[in-house]
Regions:
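Domain-level signal for soluble alpha/beta catalytic cores
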Residues: 1-149
Length: 149
């Protein structure tokens, strides 16, 4: 109905995280011919707890994490990048991240879509990581330690 009423873009913004928003984006893409938007919150919502307001923390019974204690539910930059690629593959073209997103989330989303944002220069060079890197200049005892992690 939104498209018939003149909407240029139909989609979802906020409330749901990537995992619980993606199936709905697929349904929207099937239902409309216009552009589709997908802007999840960067939190690990589930089928049992589909919105970031409904998340519960097993480490703090009786305490609701929303709105100020959502830290343990934060998506990684890789999860946001995977969401962006999957949403793009579904045909969503208006993509972003809503409440709680950090610069690293936005940068990861842009990079996953083949963009080259100015912030790309801040992507960590993991080849130089003291324990996990592959650079020949790294100390062997550090790399040996990594195999014991």
């Amino acid at each position: 109905r939104l498209e018939q009423a003149g909407a240029d873009v139909v989609g979802l913004n906020c409330i749901r995280g990537p995992e619980t928003m993606l199936p709905m984006i697929a349904e929207i893409r099937e239902a409309v011919d216009c552009h589709v938007a997908a802007l999840p919150v960067p939190y690990r919502t589930t089928d049992a707890e589909p919105s970031f307001q409904s998340l519960t923390d097993p480490h703090r019974p009786g305490h609701r994490p929303f709105p100020t204690s959502l830290d343990p539910f934060m998506c990684t930059r890789e999860e946001i990048a995977e969401f962006g690629a999957a949403a793009w593959d579904l045909g969503a073209r208006y993509l972003g991240v809503c409440c709680g997103a950090g610069a690293h989330h936005i940068r990861a989303l842009a990079l996953a879509l083949g963009r080259e944002p100015a912030g790309a220069r801040y992507v960590p060079d993991m080849s130089r990581h003291a324990f996990l890197g592959t650079d020949a200049q790294l100390k062997d005892h550090n790399r040996d330690y990594a195999s014991e992690l």
